[in-house]
Amino acid sequence: LKEEPHAMLSNGGTATFERAKEVPITMIESGPVGGVIGAAALGEIIDEENIITFDIGGTTAKTSLINKGNVRITTEYKLEQNPRFAGYPVKMPVVDIIEIGAGGGSIAWIDDVGVLKVGPKSAGADPGPACYGLGGKEPTLTDANLIAARIDPASFLGGEFKVSLDLAKEAMAPIAEHFNIDIEEAALGVIKTANNNMLNALKLISVRRGYDPRDFTMVGMGGNGAVHGPFLASELKVDKLIIPNMPSTFSAWGMLMTDLRQDFIQTQIMPVVGCDLDRVNAIYEEMEQEALAIYTKQGISPEDVVFARSADLRYIGQEHTVKTAVTGGKIKEEDLPVIRQAFDRNHHQAYTFSLEDAAAEFANFNLTAFGKVNKPDIKTVCPSGTPEAAYKGERIIDFDEQG
């Protein structure tokens, strides 16, 4: 390799393999994070600063929110969190992603009380959905989309992979028999159930965070983003849905649009009013010098390093914290009320209330250091050909508009 390889990190940046292997926990969920960073880069290109990302693959669906061009980073991320499991707290900077077990390979099944469920168990890629003809016998979301003709069998994987409608219907038959409905209706029920699960995730990342989805543009990616995106956007009253070119590999493209990034955290609990400003400034100075030393070792000049400061604040007595931006340079006494007011606003945004009269404290001081690197040039694609030349054929598709 002519250039040194880098690893994608869960904080939305990249690092050398040597740096990444020192703290491997920083690579958790780094693949999906690439899609979020790609969506932010795409938004900058097309002048869309408010974006909801939705990445639907074979096993899971993941969503994140970009507000005013800023990707939300959290230290409260919990691995494998779901309604029945609290998850494993990572306590490292991670792009804020909500993940559910709903993807193309998610298996449709009937629970003990006779209710239709989709996921989280997945058929994966091997044997995969029944329609693959590789031995899978259980009905999946992909089988349902094929039965509803929302997937074109002639164009699956560019026409290189043949899928079987008969095998999909055979797998869906037990679901239809259980509810005494036809197979096509059962397939639509599977799709609706999966869409409802996905909608819950989208609401968690937007409405539950205090954001109105109608103020955002949706970017659908992954192998199933274009299949389910239109229905999800319609339910959320999102006016614009963008499907990037080659959505299945969009996360990889997003990785190419990242800078080097290092996150530093110093835990130091002290009240906002009457805090030791000399100590606070020393903490940030120490972290900045450490970052510069790391990047200098990697051949990055100080002129190409950009710092972003923040702090995790909370009302005294609280367990959870809220990240709040802190201005660069030496922090003075007159800066503290500004930081406190920003914290109150952020807390109200996240939890719908703030306690302006309550005492607040710093819990962590954070520094993000970006090392600027060259990125691919994005070329404008000019329209060519005629609409007639783009015609591929016709088929009847069940969109269930009346259901």
Regions found by a protein language model. Name each.
Residues L1, G13-I51, K78-V95, G103-G105, ...:
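Conserved phosphate-binding catalytic cores of ATP/NTP-utilizing and phosphoryl-transfer enzymes
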Residues P5-L9, I28-S30, I52-F54, T63-L65, ...:
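General beta-strand structural signal in soluble alpha/beta enzymes
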Residues L1-T16, A20-I25, E29-P32, D126-P174:
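Gly/Ser/Thr-rich active-site cleft segment
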Residues V71-I147:
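Early-domain small/polar-rich strand-loop-helix modules and first-structured segments
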Residues V23-I25, G69-I73, T258-Q262:
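Short, hinge-like loop/turn segments at secondary-structure boundaries
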Residues T14-T16, R72, F250:
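Flexible, glycine-rich phosphate/dinucleotide-binding loops
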Residues E48, G58, I66, G103, ...:
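C-terminal, non-catalytic interaction/recognition modules in large multi-subunit enzymes and RNPs
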